Amino acid sequence: RPVIVHAQLIRDEDMPRFAQLGVIANIQPLWCYLDPMNKELIAPRIGSERNNQQYRLRSMLKAGAMIAFGSDWPVTSHVPMQAIGVPVTRSNPADGVTHPWVFKEALTMDESLTFYTKNAAYQLFREDEYGVLEVGKRATFLVLDSDPAQNPAAKIIELVS
């Protein structure tokens, strides 16, 4: 399956092409907030308007793109709940929801979980083994003290530290 990794800055006219061509957009969700690297290195080089066109997850989803998440570890954290929470809050995981970055592009918790599990397994040709909780499929379990689906988005990134 064709995949574009680090699909962070996509032109409007190219968004529907992901679905048309069956290309998976692999995105690293921990970059979906305005971090110091973005402010200091990226924004000054590409400009504010173009910078705010990065990580348009909601727009890509509306255009029919299949999105799968990856950790980008060791460059970013390997903690899955942070990676699942950031595209929902669009905020720095260390600060909670203080200054969401282009919040109109935020995902729901269910969408973020799906991109990190089911769609990631599909991208890896492992959907028959992983990705959803079904009889006969393998799973790695993480015990949490609360239900991520019932938590405010800002709390998701705090569930595992």
Q: Where is each model-derived feature located?
A:
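Short alpha-helix capping/helix-loop boundary micro-motifs
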Residues: 124-129
